[in-house]
């Protein structure tokens, strides 16, 4: 059937369908200076290529590549609710690079994925700016990424994030937990807050408490500031520690989903367990508030939140003092929180 002029459909564009290519290009131009600040000498070329290039040839003799990917969970929902978008990108970087750091690897480069229903340039620039700042702090290059505008896929004003990192470590210096032994000591390094885990429970408690945005915790910090504090980046101080005390550090753990109960044990060989003394550090005010308002059992706290311990070193017993002094010299608050013990059966972690 031939359409008559009166019935001919009006011409459509991609913008009519909800995708604004010009807005995407404008975002790229806006973030270029932020991204380039994160570049390392090994980065080849600039932004915009089909693939990002990184020259690994000069620094490593026997490099082992360590890759990681992660998101920030439902902390994003809280960011949307509070309209705070400038630090959530730091969370994204930290969740990825702190993970690969556990194996002694130096993060080399990072890529991000930002997806939204309708691109808001200001919001996206704030998020990517946070990612670039996180990469700069971690010493890795924000080498590429993807911004996807997908109409009808997300609620108005919302977006999703994912991050990807590649790190490298000399084969002879890889930390895999194989040397962890009974008697080794756990040094817990302070977190900056809940980091990016447990936020489905955080949001449920926050909602049930009436969303007290102006509430001040002990010490004068606002609750919302404590909840939105970006995940601490441990990369540079830990890499420095590995250079000076690598032989003494038998294993490491990033305390993420699963909390203290499930993360440290991941790098402990079979036949060994953990005895963690909860009294060795004070539960930070934000966790005290969450536990009280949510009537959360101790066991649930330990397996959901980091409870103030964001990263753990497993250290030879005769080297604890030296490593502890080195951690202090890096400006990191820390505590001796327990030790590795012999353990058989399913219950390998005791927190008391």
From Swiss-Prot:
A GO molecular-function descriptor: phosphoribosylformylglycinamidine cyclo-ligase activity
One Pfam family this sequence matches: AIRS_C
SUPFAM superfamilies attached to this UniProt entry: PurM C-terminal domain-like (SSF56042), PurM N-terminal domain-like (SSF55326)
Cell compartments where the protein resides: Cytoplasm
Keywords noted in UniProt: ATP-binding, Cytoplasm, Ligase, Nucleotide-binding, Purine biosynthesis
CDD domains reported in the protein's UniProt record: PurM
Catalytic activity from the UniProt record: 2-formamido-N(1)-(5-O-phospho-beta-D-ribosyl)acetamidine + ATP = 5-amino-1-(5-phospho-beta-D-ribosyl)imidazole + ADP + phosphate + H(+)
GO terms classed as biological process: 'de novo' IMP biosynthetic process; adenine biosynthetic process
Top-rank lineage group of the source organism: Bacteria
Cellular-component GO terms for this entry: cytosol
Coiled coil (UniProt feature): none
Pathway: Purine metabolism; IMP biosynthesis via de novo pathway; 5-amino-1-(5-phospho-D-ribosyl)imidazole from N(2)-formyl-N(1)-(5-phospho-D-ribosyl)glycinamide: step 2/2
Protein name, UniProt field: Phosphoribosylformylglycinamidine cyclo-ligase
Protein source organism: Stenotrophomonas maltophilia (strain K279a)
Lineage summary: Bacteria, Pseudomonadati, Pseudomonadota, Gammaproteobacteria, Lysobacterales
